[in-house]
Amino acid sequence: DKPLMYQGMSHRFYGPYDDIPFISEEDGIDFEGEFGVIVDHVPMGTKAEDAHQHIKLLVQINDWSLRTLAPAEMKTGFGWIQAKPACSMAAFAVTPDEAGAAWKDGRIHLNLEVSWNHTDFGHPHGGEMSVGFHELIAHAAATRELCAGTIIGSGTVSNDNFRATGSSCIAERRGMEIVYTGSPKTPYMHFGDQVDMQVNYPEGNLLFGVIHQRVVKLNA
């Protein structure tokens, strides 16, 4: 099976402490905790087993999403534009060796800790990625070369045991609420809300730094 992948915005990233402007709360503002990798030049047709060598840096991403806008765009059969504004990135990109034993199988085997308005929202583990980064790179490079600096995101960090680990995005929690109660209970974000994300080594040190951001209304 081919992995789900879309081509996102490449010319703009928010910093880890930036306020994030949006036009309307009605658009369904959602955070989305992810990992990512930055590659060197990847030749067209690179196979998954050869893609590991092209991974040069690991990063932590908040892939902002506008969930109310997404369904209409998905129905077109083309990629997202309005539903996927600029992402945020943590302060530090690290080489794979800096992650030590946590970097294996093309995955980051650490918890992504997420809080929303100072309340724990989830700590899913990156080791449960259904497809490793090396496989994602091979998929993206199947019919094109990837230039040095290309960023490949993991998608939402999510675990099967979500009841214990929580979530890294609101949409997943709302989906589970629909499954188990028949309707979503958790609202999307409001202006003034804050989201924090970080990844800790087992000894407690931060791997990428902290994403600490507030949602604000765009000034007209």
Range-by-range predicted roles:
Residues T150-G192, Q198, I211:
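Active-site pocket scaffolds in enzymes
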Residues I137-G149:
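Generic detector of contiguous secondary-structure segments
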Residues P96-A99, N159, P202:
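Residue-level marker for beta-strand->alpha-helix junctions and adjacent short loops that shape enzyme
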Residues D1-H139, P184-P187, H212-A220:
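Glycine-enriched loop-and-adjacent helix/strand subsegments that border the catalytic/binding cleft
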Residues D196-A220:
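Structural signal for terminal/edge beta-strands and the immediately following C-terminal loop/tail
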Residues G106-I108, R144-L146, P187-G192, N205-L207:
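A structural signal for short secondary-structure junctions
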Residues M9, G15-P16, M89, L146-S158:
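Conserved metal-binding segment of the jelly-roll/cupin
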